[in-house]
Regions:
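Divalent-cation
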Residues: 1-138
Length: 138
């Protein structure tokens, strides 16, 4: 697995689709994940240090997780199938590791809110990654 960070979140001109750019820690490889604008907002808010006036789905997931006595350990982007990214959240409770299947956008939003690391599997980096120089990312 390779650790990544959210490099950028942007909307298309219509404002209906968005892209989240994940970057490896050296910022030499980017992974664009196309998502809806609503999911982009859920990812952008914690990056800007903001919170929504009412809980979003990611906030709900965190609240339920905490109320059940579990902790969010990490998010993992596991694979790409037909352009869709498959992910999971890894939780711990009483030293037991629990993996929950979810959308990549939800995994990223939850991980950002908990300051948990985000990882991608090597094959995802190979299949979906774009080589880039840091000064080309704007």
């Amino acid at each position: 697995m390779v650790q990544v960070t959210v490099e950028k979140v942007g909307l298309d001109q219509d404002g209906e689709q968005a892209v989240v750019l994940l970057a490896d820690l050296t910022k030499t490889t980017l992974i664009p994940i196309w998502i809806r604008a609503l999911e982009a907002s859920a990812i952008a808010l914690p990056l800007q240090g903001l919170t929504a006036p009412r809980p979003l789905t990611s906030d709900l997931v965190i609240s339920v997780t905490e109320r059940l006595g579990a902790d969010v350990v990490m998010a993992i982007i596991r694979e790409v199938k037909d352009g869709a990214f498959y992910a999971s959240l890894v939780l711990t409770k009483n030293e037991e590791e629990i993996e929950i299947d979810c959308r990549a956008s939800d995994a990223i939003a939850v991980a950002l809110r908990r300051a948990s690391p985000i990882y991608v599997m090597e094959r995802v980096l190979v299949e979906a990654g774009i080589r880039s120089e840091e000064d080309n990312v704007q």
